[in-house]
Amino acid sequence: MLNAQPSFTRTPTTLIALRWLATLHIIGGIGLAVTLWLPSLHPLILKTLYGTTPIDNPQQTLFWICIIGPTVASWGVLCRICVDYFAEQPSKRTYKRLILAMLVWAPLDTTMCLSHGIYIAGVLNASVVLLFWYLCHRLWLGQQQGLTR
C-alpha cells in the first residue's frame, strides 16, 4: 500500500475548480444582494439581463433579481460543504446526489429564465452545469482509479 493517500489529493485542480465554483456563487450572490442599494448599477443590471426587452416595473424587477442573491450565496456555501464532503469521503451515493441537485435546479431555472427573456441566465446555467458535471465526474473517476490501485 504505497499509495494510501485519498484520491482527491491526486486531482487537486479538480477540487480547486469545484471550490472556486462554489466561492464564485457566494461572491456573486452577495454581489447581487448589495446591488439593490447601488442605484447607479440598476440600468446596467437590467440591460445585461433583459437587453432591449421592455420591463413593466423596473424597480420590482430589480428587487426580485437582488433578493435571489442571498439564495445563490447560500447555494455556494452548501455546494462547498458537499464538494468537501465528497472529496473527503467519495461515494457513488454522494456523487449521484450532487448530480441530482444540479438536474433539479438547471432545467427549471433555465426554462423560467428563457421564457422571461433572461437569455444570459440560460447561457450561464448551461456553462455551470457542464463545468460542475465535468468536475464532479472527474473527481469521481479519480476516486474510482484510486480504489483499483
Residue ranges and their predicted role:
Residues 130-149:
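Membrane-water interface at the C-terminal end of transmembrane alpha helices
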Residues 35, 54-84, 100-104:
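Core segments of alpha-helical transmembrane spans in multipass integral membrane proteins
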Residues 107-124, 140:
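Membrane-helix boundary connector in multi-pass membrane proteins
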Residues 1-31:
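Cytosolic juxtamembrane helix and N-cap/initiation of the first transmembrane helix
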Residues 23-63:
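Membrane-helix boundary elements
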Residues 74-78, 91-111, 126-132:
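Hydrophobic alpha-helical membrane segments
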Residues 17-24, 28, 68, 98-105, ...:
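Hydrophobic alpha-helical transmembrane segments of polytopic
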Residues 7-18, 57-64, 91-95:
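Membrane-interface helix-boundary signature
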